[in-house]
Each structure stands twice: as structure tokens, then as C-alpha cells.
């Protein structure tokens, strides 16, 4: 039986806020994944922006090899082989949940009808997390599946005009969960990641 694959991308996550003695966020679930998995402390991104970086990750190539330009935008090159295409050839059902802002930058030609997008201000704690959990509870994805989950919670804080910490959970305003809003939001994300993992069959999920 082929294992399911959950691939989580946390946009704008800094390595020093995820691991090490400088972080002040509270992340027991991510800490457990690191302890029981593999953590690459010397990993260097191929690009400082989302599309070229993710394109490189999915294709295993440098951005100039796997990114195409459509009008004024750089997109995932649909003519280049990537791991999603390879998984489909091995009879995996490939799904994605990601911000609408980037869903049309080539991802629609990778996941096609199995792509679900959400508004950029949606976060795990304001409804998105429940939708993701319901997806697992309802067995909405046919096995074996590959699920690309792109989270934008940390990006939202970079747009202060749209970020109101008073609308979020108490942890966002509690220094116990981090010395700044960025780290406190990451603490909240960890709680939700734990809930998501709790609803998975971890014995058959990578």
C-alpha cells in the first residue's frame, strides 16, 4: 500500500524562529516532527520569493530552469517535469490548498481541478484550519494522495492594514507564546498543525 504524502509550506517562515535557542515561539508539534524526523539546518533557498523558490522545490532545478514568464508575472513552468507530475504517473491523486494570490501563477496547470484556493487573509485560526481538518475527516481525497498545503498565516502580518491581533486567539496577545506577533502567530499555527496531524493516519502518511 502506497503511503499518503502531506507536503506543508509555511510561507515566510524564518529558520531561526522555527529551531534553535533564539526562538521564543511555543511549537511542541513542530519540535516533535524535528525530533522524530530530519531537520536540515544548513538548507539554503534557491530564491527569496515564493514562486521561484517553490518551483525549484517541486522540480529540483534552479529557478532559471523551471520558471516561465507570462506577461508581467513569473509562473511555475508547465512544460518542465516536476515531482507532482511524477507522482501522478505512479497513480497518486494530487491535491493542493493555497492562497488565491498565487494559485494562478502556474499551480492551476499542475493540480488542475484538484486545486482549492483561499483568500490571502485566511488563516488556520479563522476558519481555514477547520476546512483542512474536515477534508481529512470526510476522506475527500482519494488514496493514495499527495496533498500540497501552502499556509499564508505569517504573510498576513506583513500587511498591517489588514491585520488586527484583537480578532485572533488570545495567544497572539500573550508574551508567553513569543516575544513578538510573528512568533506568537507561529505558536498558534503549531497548535493547528497538531490538530491537523491528529486527524491523519500517521502510520500511512509521510
Give the predicted meaning of each segment.
Residues 1-206:
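Catalytic domains that recognize anionic headgroups
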